[in-house]
Amino acid sequence: MIAGTAGGWIDRETVLAQEGNCWIYDQNAIAFGGTVISGNTRITGTSVLWGEVYATDNVWIDNSEISQGAHISDSVTIRGSLVCGQCRIFGHALIDQHSMIVAAQGLTPDHQLLLQIYDRARVSASRIVHQAQIYGDAVVRYAFIEHRAEVFDFASIEGNEENNVWLCDCAKVCGHAQVKAGIEEDAIPTIHYSSQVAEYAIVEGNCVLKHHVLIGGNAVVRGGPILLDEHVVIQGESRITGAVIIENHVELTDHAVVEAFDGDTVHVRGPKVINGEERITRTPLAGLL
């Protein structure tokens, strides 16, 4: 940067460190209110940084608003998005496409946990709030992730312009799992409480996972609507499709299938283990399964 080059606005000289090549490139950008920019950080476009923000290393912030204690470091890229609150974004994380990162502590029993997005995680067109954790090689698009929910490893959260994916409470999506929204009305996957989608499992469409649900292996759950609640385990090569309710200590494994056809709802209530090549296409009569 050549001395005398016009840049953005700052409220005091301490905003820009004297070491490194950090700079605010656009004259319509502004940094104030205790913000510190250091290292080789680049601030471009009409960005606004305020309220004890710290941006360092090789961060690139473009056309974004960063505020209220956000700490951005390493090689993070933030484009066209909002980040506010005490959070940590580091590694090679990418946040773009009008994402909103809104950190808030004190809403869960873990009062000290900070919202974090790091490693090579990618967040696009999504809202990540409270104390959520996105890391590893996770990809999150068109999602609403709140509370202490986590997405990590190589997991993929794929909503669309019609329907977002919703993760809340202490839900986890990990491994190579995929959670996908559909384009039909209400085709919104919702993962609550301590439920998990792991390994190579796929959850798609109007599916609600509530208390103590684990979907793993190569299982496919495609709604809907589908409701899984109270200690349900879906694993192996098992498959659930159509309008299905499964609750109260039920395990599907091997190549088991629960499938509802148009106009019907299948209701399976445990305790039960459904395995082998077993196939259920209507609600079992009490005592027969």
Descriptions of predicted regions:
Residues 5-38, 42-44, 50:
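LRR N-terminal entry segment and analogous cap-like coil->beta motifs
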Residues 39-289:
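Glycine-rich hexapeptide-repeat left-handed beta-helix
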